A protein has these predicted regions:
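N-terminal hydrophobic/helix-forming segments and targeting peptides
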Residues: 1-358
Length: 358
């Protein structure tokens, strides 16, 4: 899907941590408007394209999230080094010597490098321990606090990982920052594009929430606004096909199809919806990897308990090296997740909704 690769590139290239999703939302609005009957926005920044049902009264929410993990500027020292606090879940060991982008108030992007005390200056005991985030700083190549401020740096500036979108040796393997969760953003656009000239029998809301990485916050707001009868959170899942993890689980392998999450730390998939999706996948010969994730969660955690309760499941793709500066997905998994969710939409109507409820 060349068009999908271009879509993924444009969405991962743009920067937007939790609470600073404005650029991503603006781009999503450009993509959603031509393929939607209506644009629905909440006051926190969530955005969805709506496609009206030709027949039928029920509604389905397909929800990615706009935000990516990153950092916020908390201090500038006298030498112009910048200190920061994480936004979203980070592991200290993946941060050192990585390039980042600091976005100033006027939108200027300044490149920097996360640094700390060099290895030559570490004691034997220090070398055995991960570097604490409080001992890391960002070097933007200035010599003083005044010079950093003149460049536009101030407290509260957004900091995002810097990583270019590229294909690897096998061009089905793509690497970029922010596949978590610009994958879900791209999928929402592609599903609406697939259905643009079709009649459907369920009101479809496809788009993305805000502030997922800091506690599934925007999903609660969006679900309360849309009030869907069913929901699918679209997000990435852990890939277990790398050294050190392969023996743990026989799931989450790149190239083996989308992931359907049976349970995680914040939600349990609605069983009637699970069975319906399983039937759809088998009927259309779409590969699915059924997975459990004891830790972590997705927007499903907030959506399924909104209003009077919303039958919800998470569908995504396995992703290597998530919550770091760079990650890897397989475009076939993306394509099959678009196929799967498009067929789910086509399969739903008032009768099939009643059949999956219990």
């Amino acid at each position: 899907m060349p068009e999908s690769k271009a879509l993924l590139k444009s969405l991962t290239d743009v920067n937007g941590i939790s609470g600073h999703e404005m650029q991503v939302k603006s781009l999503m609005k450009d993509y959603l408007t031509p393929v939607s009957d209506e644009i629905v926005e909440d006051r926190l920044g969530g955005i969805f394209g709506k496609k009206n049902a030709t027949h039928g009264t029920k509604s389905l929410m397909i929800s990615g999230h706009l935000d990516e993990i990153g950092f916020i500027v908390t201090q500038i020292d006298e030498q112009g080094y910048i200190y920061f606090t994480p936004i979203g879940g980070w592991w200290n060991q993946v941060m050192l010597s990585q390039k980042v982008t600091i976005t100033t108030e006027n939108g200027k992007e300044i490149r920097g490098i996360i640094g700390s005390k060099p290895t030559h200056a570490l004691s034997p005991e220090e070398r055995k321990k991960p570097v604490d985030i409080k001992n890391m700083y960002i070097d933007i190549g200035v010599g003083s606090k005044e010079e950093a401020k003149e460049a536009g740096i101030e407290l509260g500036n957004m900091i995002t990982p810097y990583s270019e979108f590229e294909s690897l040796a096998n061009d089905k393997y793509l690497t970029a920052k922010a596949f978590d969760n610009r994958y879900g953003c791209a999928l929402a656009v592609d599903v609406l594009q697939q259905l643009k000239d079709e009649n459907i029998d369920i009101n479809l809301y496809a788009g993305a929430t805000v502030q997922e990485e800091v506690g599934l916050r925007g999903a609660k707001v969006a679900a309360n606004l849309i009030k869907p009868d069913l929901a699918i959170a679209v997000d990435v899942g852990v890939a277990y096909d790398v050294p050190g993890m392969t023996s743990e689980k026989n799931e989450g392998k790149l190239g083996d199809g989308p992931l359907a999450i049976l349970m995680d730390a914040t939600s349990i998939a609605h069983d009637g919806l699970r069975k319906h999706i399983k039937d759809v996948a088998e009927h259309h010969n779409i590969p699915v990897q059924w997975a459990t994730t004891p830790g972590g969660g997705t927007d499903a955690g907030s959506i399924h308990v909104a209003n009077e309760g919303i039958p919800t499941i998470t569908i995504g793709v396995p992703l290597r090296y998530m919550h770091s500066n760079v990650s890897v997905l397989n475009i076939d998994d993306y394509t099959n997740s678009v196929r799967l969710i498009t067929e789910i939409v086509r399969s739903l109507n008032d009768d099939s909704y009643q059949a999956l409820m219990w």
